Each structure stands twice: as C-alpha cells, then as structure tokens.
C-alpha cells in the first residue's frame, strides 16, 4: 500500500 488511507483506490495495489 502507498501513503493513501485504506479504502482509497491505490494504483500501487492495482
């Protein structure tokens, strides 16, 4: 996961 909050679309996880 990136520095984005959980639940938000994360391109690094896509």
From Swiss-Prot:
GO cellular component, one term: cytoplasm
Main subcellular localisation: cytoplasm
Cofactor: Ni(2+)
Compartments where located: Cytoplasm
Molecular-function annotations in GO: metal ion binding; superoxide dismutase activity
EC number: 1.15.1.1
Record's keyword terms, sorted: Antioxidant, Cytoplasm, Metal-binding, Nickel, Oxidoreductase
Catalytic activity line of the entry: 2 superoxide + 2 H(+) = H2O2 + O2
Signal peptide segment: none
Family to which the UniProt record says this protein belongs: Belongs to the nickel superoxide dismutase family.
Subunit structure: Homohexamer.
Protein name: Superoxide dismutase [Ni]
Source species taxonomy: Bacteria, Bacillati, Actinomycetota, Actinomycetes, Kitasatosporales
